[in-house]
């Protein structure tokens, strides 16, 4: 089985610690090269996945990623975009799966508040409904 790539994005109002969380996700994924290939960051949250505006964080040096710990604001941009239900907008979910397949994404890390947790739940559910294996993880944006 080939290694799957990861998708990471920031959502909602950015906080003082959101980039530290990004650093943690990216560094942890890099430590597990046997399981995770690249880490793509979505430009402006989930919108980056829908528009296929992905940042290959593997092109960034170890020191650049480490600097995220002390970088204010949201390094990759954020959004307050809420996914509708699968019944209300199946095309949106099909588009996400298309992008995930195109980039071999099997891990979805979404950094934000309550709406972001809801997005992770929906991604997990559509993975099952649309038969695409994906692990969705919500990362809280506050301490």
In which residue ranges do the predicted regions lie?
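N-terminal low-complexity/intrinsically disordered extensions
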Residues: 1-4, 9, 37, 66-68, ...
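N-terminal phosphate-binding or glycine-rich loops at protein starts, especially the Walker A/P-loop
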Residues: 2-54
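Short glycine-rich or small-residue beta-strand-to-loop segments that form or flank ligand, phosphate
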Residues: 5-15, 75-80, 106-112
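Structural motif
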Residues: 9, 42, 110-111, 137-139
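Short acidic, glycine/serine/threonine-rich loops at helix termini
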Residues: 18-21, 50-55, 87-88, 118-124
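Glycine-rich oxoanion-binding loops at beta->alpha junctions
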Residues: 52-106, 115-116, 139, 143
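Short, acidic/small-residue loops that bind anionic groups at enzyme active sites
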Residues: 124-143
């Amino acid at each position: 089985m080939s290694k799957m790539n990861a998708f990471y994005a920031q959502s909602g109002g950015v906080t003082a610690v959101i980039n530290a969380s990004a650093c943690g996700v990216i560094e942890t994924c890099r430590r597990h090269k046997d399981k995770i290939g690249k880490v793509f960051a979505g430009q402006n949250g989930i919108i980056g996945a829908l528009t296929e505006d992905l940042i290959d964080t593997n092109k960034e040096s170890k020191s650049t990623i480490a600097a995220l710990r002390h970088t204010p604001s949201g390094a990759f941009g954020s959004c307050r975009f809420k996914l509708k239900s699968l019944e209300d907008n199946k095309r949106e979910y099909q588009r996400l799966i298309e992008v995930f397949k195109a980039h071999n994404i099997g891990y979805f890390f979404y950094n934000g508040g309550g709406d972001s947790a809801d997005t992770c739940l929906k991604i997990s559910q559509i993975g099952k409904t649309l038969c695409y294996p994906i692990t969705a993880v919500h990362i809280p944006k506050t301490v």
